[in-house]
Swiss-Prot record:
It comes from Allorhizobium ampelinum (strain ATCC BAA-846 / DSM 112012 / S4) (Agrobacterium vitis (strain S4)). ATP binds at residues 77-84. GO terms for cellular component: cytosol. The keyword Membrane does not apply. This is Protein RecA. One of its GO terms (molecular function) is damaged DNA binding. Belongs to the RecA family. The lineage of its organism: Bacteria, Pseudomonadati, Pseudomonadota, Alphaproteobacteria, Hyphomicrobiales. SUPFAM superfamilies: P-loop containing nucleoside triphosphate hydrolases, RecA protein, C-terminal domain. It comes from the Bacteria. PANTHER family: MITOCHONDRIAL DNA REPAIR PROTEIN RECA HOMOLOG-RELATED, RECA.
Amino acid sequence: MSQNSLRLVEDKTVDKSKALEAALSQIERSFGKGSIMKLGANEKIVEVETVSTGSLSLDIALGIGGLPKGRIIEIYGPESSGKTTLALQTIAEAQKKGGVCAFVDAEHALDPVYARKLGVDLQNLLISQPDTGEQALEITDTLVRSGAIDVLVIDSVAALTPKAEIEGEMGDSLPGMQARLMSQALRKLTGSISRSNCMVVFINQIRMKIGVMFGSPETTTGGNALKFYASVRLDIRRIGAVKDREEIVGNQTRVKVVKNKMAPPFKQVEFDIMYGEGVSKTGELVDLGVKAGIVEKAGAWFSYNSQRLGQGRENAKIFLRDNPAVADEIETALRQNAGLIAERFLENGGPDANDSVGLDDA
């Protein structure tokens, strides 16, 4: 009896494997070789290429060393919080590795002088200032399909105005038109983005919902589609000012990883964005170094490997700026301990009401 049942199980297994082989060969005949495969058959599929954000602490918080290529990224926050700065820093980092980048300036507000100060190579940056949202997304689609672009930034979703709205009268009510435009565009783009290994960064603005009694009234523009298609969503906020005596020289910035398909989300980091300079790398090295025990702090003095960096945080930053070899040593040590730092020292923001609200249809 047991032999009969064993033979029956073996026959079923053989039948299943034959049926699977037949199905796979039929799919490959219909749609081409490689249209379906076992995930482990190609090791390259498992590895995700990344581009640094220009912020060491944010790279660590993202869990994979930066923003993933071949994915959709959303950066949103209030006005003057550092959204475009973060996107431009990402472009600069991609260009340092020989990447080709494009900037779709729907807001018509990109400052080339500021971009150059952040390290962007303007000679090799493609820029488009489209008239309508449809034109912007068509240009994006063409660039992505070319397979030649590494990072493409769209600034911003709120400025992607539908053609019907531009051709209409002031005050015309066209509810949900921008949301439909974004939904259709993302359906078309998502496959091309993955195949071309191009990172597409959407910058988005915040609006207030009227009549919200509980939870956060904040929402982002462009409908729900972007929220679902994005692999990483970053919420960036200005939380204070960086002062040199009485003069304000930068912003204290907090970034929360609201969504992350590549690693655990809700990590929260703080860093300085200096005017005309971008993310303060030396400030991050001092702060993260102290947290990780790589940089020693005794009273107001900072030291590394028995070498004094300076008295006070600003002097330590100046020392590291003047001694890049020491700064590189500290950065290497921090990146080697990235997992431990992310787990122990980066604040876990946890989901809040704003992370779970639906986006509006505007």
